[in-house]
Amino acid sequence: YGAQPRLLGPKLNPNDLDEEGRLKAEATLIEAVDDAEYFGARGIAFLAGKWSEETKDEAYAQLLKTTVNVCRYAAMKNMNVELEIFDYDVDKAALIGPAPLAAKFAADVRSYCPNFGLLVDLSHFPICHESSADVIRTCRPYITHLHFGNAVADPEAKGYGDLHQRFGYPGSANDVQDL
C-alpha cells in the first residue's frame, strides 16, 4: 500500500522537528496500515520528509521515532513497513536520500523492528547522483522492494525529474539495458 500520497498531499513530514507535526504524520501512517490491512495488502511504503543540513541529525532522530512506532503497530497486524528512497536535493528533497544514509537508517530501524525494509526505485538513482550498482550494493541487506522506473537527470532537458518516463525516453537516465 503506497502511503506516500497521504504524506505529500497535506505536506506531512514524518521527520518534522515540530513534535505535533511529526505526530500528525505518524497518525496518518498508522491509518495507512489500517487501510492496507482492509485492502489485503501486506504492508505500507512511505517516504521521509524534507530536511535541512543544519537540523539533519534531529530530523533523522524524528524519522527513526516515527518509523519504529509505525513498524511496531504494523507488526501487531503481521505487516511490513518500507521506506522509499527518494532524491534528497532535487524534487522531493527527502532526508532518505543517499544510499549510505538509507542503509544506516535501515540498520537502525531493524535493530528494533525486523518488519522494516527499503523500497528502492531505479528512477531515483540518477537524481540521487548514484549508480544502480552502488545503491543495490550498499542497501542490499535491507531491500524488500525494487521498482523499475526512469527519470531525466539533466535539469536543462525536457521532462526533467522523476516522472517515470518510458525506458529509452530522450535524455533519460535509464534504458532497457539498465534493467
Over which residues does each language-model region extend?
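Generic secondary-structure boundary/loop-capping signal
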Residues: 1, 9-14, 164
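Domain-start "cap" segments at the beginnings of catalytic or binding domains
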Residues: 1-7, 20, 29, 143, ...
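Active-site beta-loop-alpha junctions enriched in small/polar residues
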Residues: 1-6, 49-51, 86-90, 121-127, ...
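Compositionally biased, intrinsically disordered low-complexity regions enriched in proline and serine
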Residues: 2, 61, 168-170
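Short acidic/His/Gly/Ser-rich catalytic and metal-binding motifs that mark active-site loops
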Residues: 5-11, 46, 154-159
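Active-site acidic/histidine proton-transfer and metal-coordination neighborhood
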Residues: 11-117, 127
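Histidine-acidic metal/acid-base catalytic patches
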Residues: 40-41, 100-117, 126-179
